[in-house]
């Protein structure tokens, strides 16, 4: 049987589902595109949990009918009732588990696109090369999922890869999966320039920030912003020598700096840089709030802090280890070609288990 508090919550969701269903048929809602889109999204989110709850209620009715039948004078009917009751109880357990997962608190950012930031850390040129490997891995993962990747800014490494690269990843549910990639990534391998065959260790930092819609973005006082323009470097032919199209935004109160030079238009570069800046400031505010809440439960969503090592890629052993859940796979080639769901599926399962534990603690 479901916990009474969970059942009350589900009944409230059924009422809201019916309310949203009625609202979607009203002319003033249909004519308001933003409201209609918002309610449609809420309706589709409620639909699955309400459908599952209806199955659960039907299951309870089936069990009650089977219990009545189990008291019949006919032995054959009693045997049939016992079999039905056994099957219904098994289905009840599965439905309860499904409902609990559907009721887990959802991150409102999960369905959003995101900004991916990769920075080379310790290890010099080898760290920059590894940053390039990570970006290629994420690009292939995005391709497998039908997501789009656009580079916002990039600083090339001297011998390949990137000292820093920022990209925009767009598609359904991008942030919900990519957010688990934030943190320190370490590589152990023999560099091509190493004549003695010694294994070197290098590191990169990955930060994943949700793209905040303009209507919800943090307001930035223009007086708090320093804007610098400069000539773009890299590909672009003569154009890069003629115009100061590159933009550097500095948010003075926080010291956050964002550069963008990928577009030929200064206006477009500024818009992209502002979106990244707003995402970073939002992240700072979220981290501050989280610290104030002082959560004692582990958080599998990384902060992007370089000191927070989340994964090691060992080339000689073809091994990849995720330190948050002590998962080791000897399938490095598959992971590097974009099959990171091998790791992410396990992390998300663990994350949901942590949330379920917190949910049950709150009901005790």
UniProtKB/Swiss-Prot annotation:
Main location: cytoplasm
InterPro entries reported for this sequence: PCRF (IPR005139), Pep_chain_release_fac_I (IPR000352), Pep_chain_release_fac_I_sf (IPR045853), Prokaryotic/Mito_RF (IPR050057), RF-1 (IPR004373)
Region (Disordered): 286-315
Biased composition (Basic and acidic residues): 286-297
Modified residues (N5-methylglutamine): 238
Alphabetized UniProt keyword annotations: Cytoplasm, Methylation, Protein biosynthesis
Gene3D superfamilies registered for this protein in UniProt: 3.30.160.20, 3.30.70.1660, 6.10.140.1950
Compartments, record wording: Cytoplasm
Keyword field contains Protein biosynthesis: yes
Annotated Gene Ontology cellular component terms: cytoplasm
GO terms of molecular function: translation release factor activity, codon specific
Signal sequence extent: none
Post-translational modification: Methylated by PrmC. Methylation increases the termination efficiency of RF1.
Family: Belongs to the prokaryotic/mitochondrial release factor family.
Entry function: Peptide chain release factor 1 directs the termination of translation in response to the peptide chain termination codons UAG and UAA.
Name listed for the protein in its UniProt record: Peptide chain release factor 1
Source organism: Idiomarina loihiensis (strain ATCC BAA-735 / DSM 15497 / L2-TR)
Gene coding for it: prfA
């Amino acid at each position: 049987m479901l916990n009474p508090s969970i059942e009350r919550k589900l009944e409230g969701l059924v009422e809201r589902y019916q309310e949203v269903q009625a609202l979607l048929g009203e002319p003033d809602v249909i004519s308001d595109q933003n409201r209609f889109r918002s309610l449609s999204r809420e309706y589709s989110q409620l639909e699955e949990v309400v459908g599952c709850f209806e199955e659960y209620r039907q299951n309870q009715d089936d069990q009650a009918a089977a219990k009545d039948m189990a008291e019949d004078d006919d032995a054959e009917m009693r045997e049939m009732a016992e079999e039905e009751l056994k099957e219904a109880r098994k289905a009840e357990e599965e439905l309860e588990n499904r409902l609990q997962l559907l009721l887990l608190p959802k991150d409102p950012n999960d369905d959003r696109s995101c900004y991916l930031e990769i920075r080379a850390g310790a290890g010099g040129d080898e760290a920059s090369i590894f940053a390039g490997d990570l970006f290629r891995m994420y690009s292939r993962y995005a391709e497998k999922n039908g997501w789009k990747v656009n580079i916002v800014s990039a600083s090339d490494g001297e011998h390949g890869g990137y000292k820093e690269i920022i990209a925009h990843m767009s598609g359904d549910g991008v942030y919900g999966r990519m957010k688990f990639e934030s943190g320190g990534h370490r590589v152990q391998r023999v560099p091509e320039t190493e004549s003695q065959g010694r294994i070197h260790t290098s590191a990169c930092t990955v930060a994943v920030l949700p793209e905040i819609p303009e209507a919800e973005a943090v307001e930035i006082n223009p007086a708090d912003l320093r804007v610098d323009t400069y000539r773009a470097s890299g590909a672009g032919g003569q154009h890069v020598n003629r115009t100061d199209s590159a933009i550097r935004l500095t948010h003075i109160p926080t010291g956050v700096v964002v550069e963008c030079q990928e577009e030929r238009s200064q206006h477009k570069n500024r818009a992209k840089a502002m979106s990244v800046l707003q995402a970073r400031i939002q992240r700072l505010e979220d981290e501050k709030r989280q610290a104030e809440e002082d959560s004692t439960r582990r958080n599998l969503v990384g902060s992007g802090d370089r000191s927070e090592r989340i994964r090691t890629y060992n080339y000689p052993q073809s091994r990849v280890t995720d330190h948050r859940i002590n998962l080791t796979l000897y399938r490095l080639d598959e992971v590097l070609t974009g099959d990171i769901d091998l790791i992410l599926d396990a992390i998300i399962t663990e994350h949901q288990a942590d949330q379920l534990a917190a949910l049950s603690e709150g009901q005790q």
